[in-house]
């Protein structure tokens, strides 16, 4: 039997549709064709297996105890996930019957692993082929089916994903337990959830918030002067130029080359007023600008965040709908901005489809010449998947939502740009010497918009307008300085992060790294997280109540700030994590050993545990006596309200949890030290149902973990996990 294993049901249906009939549907499978050429298509539902919990390796590890740390499993174990156990059983039976298996996971790191791990777990001896499907339209799927590759070619990709999975387990579970237990011994409350990627991302937000909070504006001075040609036959148009600080003024400048000393500015103005000068440099040119490449997921999220203020997860979910439900775009979780050269032959069909699905772009589609070939088509730059582009499908499955239409239009615009002419900029520069000072004026103008007619323009704060044309003067021509001025300005704090700028920071993490050598290395890597995980990382920080939104800005909660303050710098900064991502990329390319990477990580975890945690939080409660919020488990304080005294959450207004005053310890367990959820590490909260007391995750409905109650404390055995 030939068995195809897809990553998800929607992909399985697309594969079945491309295989010959008749089709027979069963529970968790689709049979295609008859006789010896028949094939069966089944699917995973994301990861069917998950890393075993600590207690699976050692029953003593179920209880959180500092003496059991660090926990390094050997050998590693996977267990079927309860929520998808039925589909796992279906797939297990099919794999055991198969004499040929085709791996059809998504064309990325996780897509490779989630099918590979099932095959390894079941110990199949059948040969395994691999197909890469970036486009769910029938012709594209059929093309992929006809071009299978040996799955062994993708072993390094699978090793990279497996190393990432194990690194997350080692780092997250060990350090979360270590820092939680360390602070609880000091009377602190709550669970200190530490993640290999999420913690440095939170650190970026906390550092930005702290910078803004402690920012002290300082005055700085810009010296400008108006110049005009002295000779009557020369171009007499006046122009404004800015002073260029020389090396002798470095002591009066800040790190951004701004003048901080007003007396120096006044001295310059006095020295040049009415004085003759000379053109030192006159440069004018027309500069072509090629179109930007098609979009990767991060580029799409950044653009959509900037233009439409869409959150990273919203963009990903919308793109996933366009891919799976409507089949209007190619695989959305791509980190590539290049296209395979063979795809160039489909350009006319894609452009016709864009004109149908996005009527607002039909005029551009009609004018687009299809002979131009931008730098995007380059096989050498394409790996498992290519840039996100529209498919040849001309109609959606039903009406597109407003968000879906915006994302489709955005992807289409960047595709159409590949056939548009270069934009042409006219640039000019005049450098003037007057006395011992130098001034410079610049000119910028778009004289032929080219691909920019497809660009959605949105003026960014602080963006300077196009500069007026300069007079056409030549080197050594005399000029006269008139109306020199000193303009006082104030330094401005940076803005709080938005979805777009935080994603940009994660993809360009080298900007936030202090070490010069490390920064140079990181410029070659993808930064923190991957295309497929960045939105989920940000979402996790919101769900764990480390971040909150203030209009379009992302801010850190007090809980998030406390966590970062409590951790060593090497855990809360991006340096080490970004290096790990670079190492994982090396594993993917077959250049790094995943075992060496994990051994190095174990050494680092031992090093963290050898250091005493910093005192990040002030203990204001007597251990064991504090009342904690039933919603977020933060400490509560007594407040006076309209109807008398009550307990209120100290995190108000971010959390509006309250509880009445009681003469005894509350039955819901909020007077006890928080116990972490075994699934997501959020605090457990005691709740009452018709059958009696139980403990549920405070992160409900994001996490539905429940634990039995045993004499007012969470029991060891789990009652339910989904």
Indicate where each model-derived feature is located.
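C-terminal or mid-to-C-terminal helical accessory/interaction module adjacent to the motor/catalytic core
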Residues: 140-225, 285
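A conserved hydrophobic secondary-structure block that centers on an alpha-helix together
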Residues: 106, 307-311
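Intrinsically disordered, low-complexity regulatory segments
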Residues: 1-169, 173, 493
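Basic, low-complexity terminal or inter-domain segments flanking catalytic cores
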Residues: 2-3, 84, 121, 176, ...
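Metal- or metallocofactor-binding catalytic centers and their adjacent structured scaffolds
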Residues: 251-293, 575
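Glycine-centered, phosphate/nucleic-acid-interacting loop/turn motifs that mediate DNA/RNA or nucleotide
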Residues: 326-327, 545
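Structured, non-catalytic alpha/beta "coupling" segments that mediate domain-domain communication
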Residues: 27-57, 199-248, 416-468, 600, ...
């Amino acid at each position: 039997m030939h068995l195809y294993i897809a990553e998800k049901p929607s992909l399985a249906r697309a594969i079945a549709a491309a295989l010959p009939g008749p089709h027979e549907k069963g529970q968790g499978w689709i049979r295609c064709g008859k006789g010896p050429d028949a094939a069966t298509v089944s699917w995973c539902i994301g990861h069917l297996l998950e890393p075993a919990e600590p207690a699976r390796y050692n029953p003593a590890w179920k209880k959180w105890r500092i003496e059991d740390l660090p926990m390094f499993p050997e050998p590693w174990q996977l267990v079927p996930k309860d929520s998808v156990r039925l589909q796992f059983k279906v797939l297990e039976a099919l794999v055991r019957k198969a004499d040929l298996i085709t791996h059809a996971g998504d064309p990325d790191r996780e897509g490779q692993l989630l099918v590979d791990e099932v095959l390894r777990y079941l110990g199949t001896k059948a040969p395994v082929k691999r197909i890469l499907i970036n486009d769910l339209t029938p012709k594209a799927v059929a093309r992929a089916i006809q071009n299978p590759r040996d799955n062994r070619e993708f072993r390094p990709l699978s090793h990279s994903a497996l190393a990432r999975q194990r690194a997350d387990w080692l780092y997250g579970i060990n350090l979360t337990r270590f820092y939680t237990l360390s602070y609880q011994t000091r009377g602190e409350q709550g669970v200190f959830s530490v993640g290999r990627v999420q913690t440095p991302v939170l650190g970026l937000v906390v550092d930005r918030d702290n910078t803004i909070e402690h920012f002290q504006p300082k005055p700085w001075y810009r010296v400008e002067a108006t110049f005009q040609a002295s000779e009557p036959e020369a171009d007499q148009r006046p122009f404004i130029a800015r002073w260029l600080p020389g090396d002798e003024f470095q002591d009066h400048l800040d790190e951004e080359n701004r003048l901080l000393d007003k007396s120096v500015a006044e001295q310059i103005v006095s020295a040049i007023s009415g004085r003759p000068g000379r053109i030192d440099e006159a440069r004018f040119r027309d500069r072509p600008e090629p179109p930007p490449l098609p979009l990767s997921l991060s580029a799409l999220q950044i653009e959509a965040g900037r233009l439409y203020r869409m959150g990273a997860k919203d963009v990903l979910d919308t793109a996933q709908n366009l891919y799976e439900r409507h089949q209007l775009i190619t695989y959305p979780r791509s980190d590539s901005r290049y296209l395979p050269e063979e795809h160039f032959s489909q350009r006319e069909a894609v452009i016709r489809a864009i004109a149908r699905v996005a009527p607002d772009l039909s005029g551009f589609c009609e004018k687009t010449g299809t002979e131009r070939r931008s730098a995007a088509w380059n096989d050498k730059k394409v790996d498992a998947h290519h840039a996100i582009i529209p498919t040849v499908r001309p109609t959606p499955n039903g009406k597109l939502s407003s968000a879906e239409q915006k994302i489709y239009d955005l992807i289409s615009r960047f595709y159409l740009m590949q056939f548009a002419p270069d934009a042409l900029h006219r640039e000019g520069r005049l450098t003037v010497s007057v006395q011992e000072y130098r001034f410079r004026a610049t000119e910028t103008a778009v004289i032929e918009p080219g691909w920019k007619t497809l660009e959605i323009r949105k003026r960014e704060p602080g963006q300077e307008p196009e500069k007026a044309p300069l007079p056409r003067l030549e080197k050594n021509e005399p000029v006269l300085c008139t109306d020199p001025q000193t303009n006082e300005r104030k330094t401005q704090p940076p803005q709080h992060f938005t979805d777009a700028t935080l994603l940009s920071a994660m993809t360009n993490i080298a900007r936030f790294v202090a070490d010069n050598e490390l920064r140079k290395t990181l410029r070659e890597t993808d930064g923190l997280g991957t295309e497929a995980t960045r939105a989920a990382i940000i979402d996790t920080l919101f769900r764990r109540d480390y971040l909150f939104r203030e209009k379009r800005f992302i801010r850190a909660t007090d809980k998030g700030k406390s966590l970062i303050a409590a951790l060593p710098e090497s855990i809360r900064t991006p340096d080490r994590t970004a290096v790990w991502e670079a190492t994982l990329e090396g594993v993917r390319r077959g250049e790094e050993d995943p075992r060496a990477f994990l051994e190095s990580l174990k050494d680092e975890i031992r090093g963290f545990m050898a250091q005493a945690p910093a005192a990040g939080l002030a203990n204001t409660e007597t251990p064991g006596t504090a009342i904690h919020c039933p919603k977020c488990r933060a400490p509560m304080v007594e407040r006076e309200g309209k109807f008398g005294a009550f307990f209120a959450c100290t995190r108000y207004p971010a959390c509006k949890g309250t509880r009445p005053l009681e003469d005894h310890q509350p039955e819901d367990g909020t007077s006890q030290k928080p116990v972490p959820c075994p699934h997501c590490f959020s605090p457990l909260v005691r709740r009452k149902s018709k059958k009696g007391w139980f403990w549920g995750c405070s992160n409900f409905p994001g996490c539905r973990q429940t634990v039995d109650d045993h004499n007012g404390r969470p029991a060891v055995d789990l009652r339910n996990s989904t």
